Amino acid sequence: MQAFFANPAVSWTLLTTGGILLVVIWVLLSLAFLLLADRKIWAGVQMRKGPNVVGPFGLLQSFADFFKFVLKEIVIPAGADKVVFILAPLISLILAFVGWAVVPFAPGWVVSNLNVGILYLLAMSSLGVYGIIMGGWASNSKYPFLGALRSAAQMVSYEVSIGLIIITVILLAGSMNLSTIVEKQSGWIWNWNVFGGGLNNLVLLPVMVVAMGMFYISALAETNRPPFDLPEAESELVAGYQVEYSSTPYLLFMVAEYSNIVLMCAMISVLFFGGWNPGFPTDFLSSWHPFAANLFLALVFYAKICFWFFMFAMAKAIVPRYRYDQLMRLGWKVFLPTSLVLVAAVAAWRVFGPAA
């Protein structure tokens, strides 16, 4: 038995499987309480209480909703393509979770430390729209199909800007490894990429602040989040691509959507706000137990994710929905040329600046 566990292939498989399970459990538990927080924030803006019945302060509301969804009957429309109809939410959910494989929670706390992790994240976030397109087409109904087409157009429009903004971070960090990008931002708060990545690069502060703002807005559009929730606009498409879904498949779509939102919050934290770095030197952690030190840094990272989720929730609560033509105009006529200028500015500084 000891020889079996000493086998490198076996130990790697067990460690990777354990890491995947831990991340999935963490994401699911986080979604349960962040979804409640989203509803509470929305209620607070509208001067009402929000969910407050199930459990103390309504803390168990998400778990009650889970049982409500799971125990309902799965209704499949008569004219729907049954296989694709059921596969669509599963594909959306899987693609929403696989992106977490390269997110570094603390030094060494990452499922797969890929050297091209940032490209992997970009690819996974792009593929998520296929589940929505499949669901809209398989429903054999006008509203879901229109919602799916809107989602595809929206993703294409804003994925370009997200990719170009990521290039500015790659130019600053000199790496596509997410752990390396975070490590480059260690030390004081001015080493974070949003401030230019160090005092020597402080001239890039306005460039990176604009890049961060554009990334945040593009992330709202990428995740079909208000004010860019055109694929599920209630006043036009009832519920968009989710119209014909009920019970567990609907729940899977909702979990996938919120998982993508939290993943985008994690990306903003990693790319611009130092990831697990608290904004001051962490030399004092050398005297701590390694697990305790990493747990502290992981909590710092989680606090940043929660802050950005709060920003997503506030955008949902206070910003009115854009019209479809305004959404496209913003993506192609404003964000695309601006992001190209930002890439050129950072590249010029890296080539001709004092640190060249």
From Swiss-Prot:
Belongs to the complex I subunit 1 family. Keywords: Cell inner membrane, Cell membrane, Membrane, NAD, Quinone, Translocase, Transmembrane, Transmembrane helix, Ubiquinone. The chain crosses the membrane at residues 17-37, 51-71, 83-103, 116-136, 162-182, 202-222, 261-281, 295-315, 334-354. It is an enzyme of class 7 (translocase). It is found in: Cell inner membrane. It comes from Caulobacter vibrioides (strain ATCC 19089 / CIP 103742 / CB 15). GO terms for molecular function: NADH dehydrogenase activity; oxidoreductase activity, acting on NAD(P)H, quinone or similar compound as acceptor; quinone binding. Pfam families: NADHdh. It is a multi-pass membrane protein. PROSITE patterns: COMPLEX1_ND1_2. InterPro entries: NADH_UbQ_OxRdtase_su1/FPO, NADH_UbQ_OxRdtase_su1_CS. This is NADH-quinone oxidoreductase subunit H. It comes from the Bacteria. The lineage of its organism: Bacteria, Pseudomonadati, Pseudomonadota, Alphaproteobacteria, Caulobacterales. NDH-1 is composed of 14 different subunits. Subunits NuoA, H, J, K, L, M, N constitute the membrane sector of the complex. GO terms for cellular component: plasma membrane. One of its GO terms (biological process) is aerobic respiration. The keyword Transmembrane applies. Its EC number is 7.1.1.-. It catalyses: a quinone + NADH + 5 H(+)(in) = a quinol + NAD(+) + 4 H(+)(out). NDH-1 shuttles electrons from NADH, via FMN and iron-sulfur (Fe-S) centers, to quinones in the respiratory chain. The immediate electron acceptor for the enzyme in this species is believed to be ubiquinone. Couples the redox reaction to proton translocation (for every two electrons transferred, four hydrogen ions are translocated across the cytoplasmic membrane), and thus conserves the redox energy in a proton gradient. This subunit may bind ubiquinone.
